[in-house]
UniProtKB/Swiss-Prot annotation:
Purpose of the protein: One of the primary rRNA binding proteins, it binds specifically to the 5'-end of 16S ribosomal RNA.
Name of protein: Small ribosomal subunit protein uS17
GO annotation, biological process: translation
Record Pfam families: Ribosomal_S17 (PF00366)
Species of the source: Vibrio parahaemolyticus serotype O3:K6 (strain RIMD 2210633)
Gene Ontology terms, MF aspect: rRNA binding; structural constituent of ribosome
InterPro entries: NA-bd_OB-fold, Ribosomal_uS17, Ribosomal_uS17_bact/chlr, Ribosomal_uS17_CS
Self-association state and partner proteins as the record states: Part of the 30S ribosomal subunit.
């Protein structure tokens, strides 16, 4: 049986590490009392084998086995490069 891998889209906020990127994933959550949709951000570390991502790129990442203490996502593809 094959597992369905969880994928997310997000924006690269840091690429200072070697073969690693920090991706900010935005989601909208409904406020429990007021009902307004509020933007929430989650930051995750992802593995970038070829160091191809830059700050501001929109990327797709997939969940994988833990690669380090904080890194358990891997880069699938760069959806859109950042405008310089």
């Amino acid at each position: 049986m094959s597992e369905v891998k969880r994928t997310q889209q997000g924006r690269v906020v840091s690429d200072k590490m070697d073969k690693s990127i920090t991706v900010a994933i935005e989601r909208f959550v409904k406020h429990p009392i007021y009902g307004k949709f509020v933007k929430r951000t989650t930051k995750v570390h992802a593995h970038d084998e070829n160091n191809e991502c830059g700050i501001g790129d929109t990327v797709e990442i997939a969940e994988c086995r833990p690669l380090s203490k904080t890194k358990s996502w891997t880069l699938v593809k760069v959806v859109e490069k950042a405008k310089m």
